[in-house]
């Protein structure tokens, strides 16, 4: 999952405005860091779904260093409050917003329509837009292993 977050943030950098050719002749200015926000459905605890997303956020910071500045808003209920928080982050100038709960998909899509310059990544969502992408875990890998284990534990060597 960390690789996916780093890749998504790196891809977002490709969509950011590039300075004009005329400005290239001037002395190179320091590039402002990408502003990335993460919206969590629960507080960050020692383990669990939100903890893993926060580990991914930390990996992004480690990989990109001064090239990224992250913001976290935790314990955001799904629904109207989620839309308010996501909209507020977009208004603050966040360039990419990761929403880490299925219930954030619709609010993120509504906010994305009003902020086409902001990129959104909805985790476990399935609806996309020009500035909204989706990501998900590879659940099938764990399910496959559970099936193999179930078959090996059965008397017949078959699951089911």
Predicted feature locations:
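Periplasmic-binding protein-like
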Residues: 93-101, 121-123
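Bacterial N-terminal signal peptides
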Residues: 7-17
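Flexible loop/hinge segments that line or gate small-molecule binding clefts
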Residues: 113-136
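Boundary at the C-terminal end of the N-terminal hydrophobic targeting segment
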Residues: 20-24
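Hydrophobic alpha-helical segments within soluble ligand-binding/sensing domains
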Residues: 135-157
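Extracytoplasmic "Venus flytrap"
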Residues: 35-56, 60, 71-82, 102
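Positively charged n-region of N-terminal signal peptides that target proteins for export
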Residues: 1-4
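Short, well-structured alpha-helical segments in soluble
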Residues: 79-93
């Amino acid at each position: 999952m960390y690789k996916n977050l780093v890749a998504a943030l790196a891809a977002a950098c490709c969509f950011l405005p590039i300075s004009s050719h005329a400005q290239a002749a001037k002395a190179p200015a320091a590039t402002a860091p990408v502003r990335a926000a993460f919206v969590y459905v629960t507080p960050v605890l020692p383990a669990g779904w939100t903890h893993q997303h926060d580990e991914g956020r930390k990996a992004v910071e480690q990989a990109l260093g001064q090239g990224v500045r992250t913001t976290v808003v935790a314990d955001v209920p799904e629904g109207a409050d989620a839309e308010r928080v996501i909209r507020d982050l977009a208004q603050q100038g966040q360039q990419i917003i990761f929403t880490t709960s299925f219930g954030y998909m619709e609010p993120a899509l509504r906010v994305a329509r009003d902020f086409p310059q902001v990129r959104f990544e909805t985790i476990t969502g399935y609806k996309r837009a020009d500035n909204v992408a989706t990501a998900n875990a590879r659940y099938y890998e764990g399910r496959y292993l559970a099936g193999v284990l179930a078959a090996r534990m059965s008397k017949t060597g078959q699951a089911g």
